[in-house]
Curated annotation (Swiss-Prot):
Substrate binds at residues 55, 62-63, 163, 273. Binds 1 zinc ion per subunit. The keyword Zinc applies. One of its GO terms (cellular component) is cytosol. Pfam families: AstE_AspA_cat, AstE_AspA_hybrid. Keywords: Hydrolase, Metal-binding, Zinc. HAMAP family: Aspartoacylase. This is Probable aspartoacylase. Its EC number is 3.5.1.15. It comes from Prochlorococcus marinus (strain NATL1A).
Length: 305
């Protein structure tokens, strides 16, 4: 049986520095974080962007892990080259194959701490259920968005993204660092419990399923001509109902939520998403029954069956 190995990534975006700082301190003091004896690799996702103090150099690294893009190194694209390196080093067929990838991020939006799952892979949903049961974190299921693909964790058999905010880009914050450490240790603890078959899965999983993203108001030339309404700013995870305020213009015009069905907004006014023409994303809160297939998939993965 292969040794269980977990890839821990911080700095997938070079200006999200709290996880990077935590990893650097961890290297100095190996006892700082309890991995419960599980072999881990702590990796800075985008070291070149970190040096430059930028989110990325040529292309968003967390959109660079697309199927078929690892065939050859592209010297003209730092992030696609780095994506290939990470898969070659730590992917299923890599030099140090990891079964699970955990990618630690921060956000400028008032998201608090949450877990992001891409698609509906059984092992992902099982691990997300465990961490939600332990810490009560919301789970954002990102799917059905063809404009946003190629996420890092999708290149591993099981993978979750941890998002913590709000925090400005390039800033250290004690709360963010403490939350990152807590979630990392809890994830490792739960993986350890699965490894030892000493685990308790919840009966339900609360999901915030991605519906769509919306852009800022724009004028005829494509320039942003409105901003997030004061009643919507910093109200991530709070239900939107028809006619609630979304945006405001300087002339006093208010743009309202027009959907008949209530949605839950997330990543409201995230600074890094402006270039992606995203002002916020809408989700639908759903209560899912925990499936035995999820549990078995995670157990089989960790025990290499």
């Amino acid at each position: 049986m292969k040794q269980l190995q977990v890839l821990l990534v911080a700095g997938t975006h070079g200006n999200e520095i709290n996880g990077i700082w935590l990893f650097d301190e961890w290297k100095k003091s190996s006892f700082l974080i309890n991995t419960h004896g599980i072999k881990t690799f702590q990796v800075i996702g985008n070291p070149e962007a970190k040096k430059a103090g930028k989110r990325y150099i040529h292309h968003d690294l967390n959109r660079s892990f697309k199927e078929g893009s690892f065939i050859k190194i592209n010297p003209l694209n730092c992030e696609r080259t780095r994506a290939s390196e990470l898969v070659n080093l730590y992917g299923e067929a890599g030099e140090n194959p990891c079964q699970i990838a955990l990618d630690f991020h921060t956000t400028t939006a008032s998201m608090g701490s949450c877990i992001v799952v891409y698609g509906r892979r059984d092992a992902d949903l099982a691990l997300a259920s465990l961490i939600q049961n332990q810490l009560g974190l919301p789970v954002y299921l990102h799917e059905s968005d063809q404009k946003q693909t190629g996420f890092l964790v999708e290149s591993w058999p099981c993978g979750l993204v941890v998002e913590i905010g709000p925090i400005g880009q390039g800033l250290l914050n004690s709360r963010i660092i403490s939350q990152t450490k807590l979630i990392l240790e809890t994830l490792m603890e739960q993986i350890h419990e699965v490894k030892n078959l000493n685990l308790f899965f919840p009966n339900k999983l609360i999901i915030h399923r991605h519906i769509k993203s919306i852009d800022f108001p724009r004028d005829e030339e494509g320039n942003i001509d409105g901003y997030v309404h004061s009643l919507r700013q910093s109200k991530d995870w709070q239900e939107l109902k028809k006619n609630d305020e979304l945006f405001c213009k300087l002339n006093g015009e208010i743009i309202r939520f027009e959907e008949d069905e209530p949605y839950i907004p997330v990543f409201i006014n995230e600074a890094a998403y402006v270039e992606k023409n995203i002002a916020m994303s809408f989700t639908k809160r759903e209560l899912w029954n925990f499936k035995k297939e999820w549990k078995q998939a995670l157990i089989d993965l960790i025990h290499q069956k």
